[in-house]
Structures are given as structure tokens and as C-alpha cells.
Amino acid sequence: MITYEYPFNERIRTLLRLEDLFEKTAYFTQEDGALEHHAALVSMFEILEVAGRADLKMDLIQELERQRQTLLAFRNNPDISEEALSGALYEIEQSSAALLGMAGKIGQYLRENDWLMSIKSRAAIPGGVCEFDLPSYHWWLHRSPETRRDALEGWLKPMLPLRDAAAIVLRLLRSSGRPKNYTATNGQFQLNLGGSAAQMVRVTVHVDEQAIPEVSANKYFLNIRFTKPPAGEIKARGCERDVAFDLTFCNL
């Protein structure tokens, strides 16, 4: 099964981008190759750009507090495990405290590192990080994998509270909905939303379906058009057959 997630507001789009970039950074950091560590650093620079929104940290703190209050209402509910509830509340409280402990603008310590910013600037230019452009970076890439990894982890560590908070919010968002099975007739599907917009929808398609969903929506209608996987065509071609899929509406 392949799941496609479609966020309907900029805040959720930002959290999904951060999740993707933190995962890439972690993956490439754990590898030993110089090229992988370069990819990790470039992903870290992208985190810096995406997280640059002035209100992102406060948005996350407020959302975590809202979820904490929601969970508190389940105290003494016989249908809810007190142990699981206490664990979830503790995780949220720890994450909020870590966010509050992030002083100043997110990633400001990286912006104040002239050497890293010179690499970031050159990395935005196609082929801009050749050894003749950045000899000091070329030297760094020839240090031991352990030395490079320690440096990457040290640069990333102050931003990890952001990763952890985003992970909590996205986990709660994804678990808020229940999938329902639908069929797109001739590759087309429309659903009347009745004026209630979701924050995100998840479309799950069996890998054997060979169909890719394209989603558009407003608070009244959800439209899904399934296209065929690309095979060298200039323009995507629509599926002209019925496609079975699961649809999940997610809201916090």
C-alpha cells in the first residue's frame, strides 16, 4: 500500500516538510560517506529555511497545549488506559518545555557560523561546492566519518525539539481519522464535504493499482483524479478505469 498525504493549510505543510527533512538528515548522517554527509548538511540547511517562520515555535507550543488540555479531559475515563494517558501527557509536557528552552530565532546559532553560511550560499548554486570553490569544506569532507558525524549531530541537536514537537502533532493528526474505502469511477472521484474542511487527507492505494492520486479541495468539495505512472510522457495521463482506494480525513 502507498499512502499519499495532502495537507490543506500552510502550517501542516510546514510540519510535513520538516518531518521529511529531519528524516533525510538523520539517514544521511548515519552513513559514512562524504557524499552522504554533504547531503545531510544540505538537508540541514533546508530545515533552517523551512523553520525560519517567526511564529512556528509558538504555533507548536500552542498546539501541544491544546492537545494536552484535550487529553486531560480523559482523566478517570474507564475506557482509557491511565498509563497510556499519563505517558502521552508526559511526552507533550517534555516537548513543550524543550521548545520553550529554545532561545532566540530557530537555528540562529547556525546563521552566526560564517563557515557554514558560506557553504549554504555556495550549495544554492548548481555545482557551487567544488573543491576550488570551498577548499576548507573539501578538507572537512576528507576528515574521518566519525569526526564529520559528530559535527553534524552537534549542529542539528539544538533543533531537535522542533523535530520532536512536529512528530507529536503529526502523529496525533494522522491518528485522528478512520479510513473509509471508496472507488474512483473511471479514475475520477468527488465528495461533498458540506462545508467542513479537514486539515489533511490521506489517500491509500494498493501498489498494484498503478494509479497516482491528484487531490484538490475546498470546504465544500474534495476532488481526486487518478493518473497513470509516468512513462516518458510529457503530460500526465488520466486513468480510464475504476480505482479502489482508502480515504482518511484528519483533523485536530
Swiss-Prot record:
InterPro entries named in the record: ZapD, ZapD_C, ZapD_sf
SUPFAM superfamilies according to UniProt? YacF-like
Segments crossing the lipid bilayer: none
Is Protease given among the entry's keywords?
A: no
SS bonds (residue pairs): none
Q: Which GO terms describe its biological process?
A: division septum assembly; FtsZ-dependent cytokinesis
Q: Does the keyword Cell cycle apply?
A: yes
Instruction: Give the matching Pfam families.
Output: ZapD
Q: Which GO terms describe its cellular component?
A: cell division site; cytoplasm
State the UniProt keywords alphabetically: Cell cycle, Cell division, Cytoplasm, Septation
Family statement drawn from the similarity comment of this UniProt entry: Belongs to the ZapD family.
- What does it do? Cell division factor that enhances FtsZ-ring assembly. Directly interacts with FtsZ and promotes bundling of FtsZ protofilaments, with a reduction in FtsZ GTPase activity.
HAMAP family (UniProt xref): ZapD (MF_01092)
Q: How does it assemble?
A: Interacts with FtsZ.
Its name, as the record gives it, is Cell division protein ZapD
**Taxonomic classification, please?**
Bacteria, Pseudomonadati, Pseudomonadota, Betaproteobacteria, Rhodocyclales
